């Protein structure tokens, strides 16, 4: 958790870390997160540069900075708006899959795919829960949101 500690990465730093990581680990699948603090045009350019440097996947972020004004579903959309916008913009310029992460929920996961993401990251939506049953329920809910399927009731 770099942001709570005040640690901000600029584009040049992310690019250099990517190059060094790729040089050390040439055969691993490398996913790199584009910092949401960059202006959108810089996020797009960084994504292109990261692919040139060897990134196999580009991940967006942004939900940690969003402060929703509304309750309910609208608040969930407001929270996810920065990462959804980044996924839309970056997927338009990226030659590799884009993963949309940060602040996603069952309401916004389908929006991420519609925005151009190839996949989603929902770690904190699950990891913040203390109960394994609740974790399973959240994962199932997210899967249903992605597939649009609802299990048959007996």
Language-model segment annotations:
Residues 1-76:
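Conserved anion-binding
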Residues 1-7, 55-71, 108-139:
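Glycine-rich phosphate-binding active-site loops on the catalytic face of alpha/beta enzymes
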Residues 9-36, 74-100, 137-154:
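Alpha-helix-loop-beta-strand connector modules within alpha/beta enzyme cores
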Residues 38-53, 88-120:
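Catalytic cores of alpha/beta
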